[in-house]
Swiss-Prot record:
Domain of life: Bacteria
GO cellular component: cytoplasm
Stated family: Belongs to the UPF0235 family.
Record Pfam families: DUF167
InterPro entries: DUF167 (IPR003746), YggU-like_sf (IPR036591)
PANTHER family: UPF0235 PROTEIN C15ORF40
Protein name: UPF0235 protein Sbal223_1335
């Protein structure tokens, strides 16, 4: 499965999360996954909450439109973004589109 898939208007992202990074950013491909660095530590769900907030801001959607489908407790996650308003260029490039 690819790192980024568009499915019925939603984005499916296969992510590799790097917690406790110096800043929040989409790093790029990491094998078959998209690497995302976040500043939050992987303690008591803080990294998941921070990731949801960061992705909501990045895709200009409410946090309720970010769903962790798989990987709640690990670094490897599958995320569904419901009807993203903006898709960053790093992701459109992976989808084979031009921004």
């Amino acid at each position: 499965m690819s790192a980024v898939t568009l499915q019925q208007g939603d984005l499916l992202l296969n992510l590799y999360i790097q917690p406790k990074a110096s800043r929040d950013q989409i790093v790029g491909l990491h094998g078959d996954e998209l690497k995302v660095a976040i500043t939050a530590p992987p303690i008591d769900g803080k990294a998941n909450a921070h990731l949801s907030k960061y992705l909501a801001k990045t895709f200009k959607v409410p946090k309720s439109d970010i769903h962790i489908m798989k990987g709640e407790l690990g670094r490897h996650k599958q995320i569904r973004v419901i009807d993203p308003k903006i898709i960053p260029s790093v992701i459109t490039e992976l989808m084979g589109q031009t921004s």
